[in-house]
Amino acid sequence: ADGDIERTDKWGFREALMRSFRRRKIFPDHVLFMTEDAVRWQPPAESMHIKGLAFRDLEFDGDPGQPASADELVRQAHALGKFVTNPKHAECFRLVAPAGKLPTGVIQASPALVQSIRVTRRAAPDGRVLFDLVGEVTQSCTVDRKGVLYDVNGGCTVVIDPEGKVRYSIYKKFDSQQRQERQLAAMRGPLKRFWKKSGRRFELRDNVLRRLHGGNR
């Protein structure tokens, strides 16, 4: 994200950050080389503009960080939700559109929910300020893995520029077989005290936060 406001890294900030991760042997999954090109977010394969979410269409209460009203926030959320769940675009955000084809292993997908939408700002070293609109969308699905049912949460963070163009979609995929396997292994192993099995389905136990913060008691 820093590369959006300082493309050349002339102060060596990003290189120093990556070097510190390499030195400690901390590497992101599926990244073969710890280089700037390998770890930076990639834009969508196709150019997408969301109607009604360009800055000229937004209403503010004086400051760009303050929406004009709750109704304006709802309007923005509806515009985002309608776009990302459109069957033409849903795959780009790794969401399941209403009545859309389910990914392999998924037997049911709940409607996607826009959890938040807000303006962000970042200051460049030369004093410029970069504005974006950031929306968070979640979706839950039920996976059937060898007769065992459990829910997997997914969704995406959508970064939209002042012209309403989608700059980034950072997502969690439902159709990742490795992710499904890792979650099932965790529910049966190190996280089993948070889950119970009812018939074929794994379900979260009551008072999960209390169990989490209460240690092994």
Question: What label would you give each PLM region?
Answer:
Residues 2-217:
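Non-catalytic terminal regions of proteins
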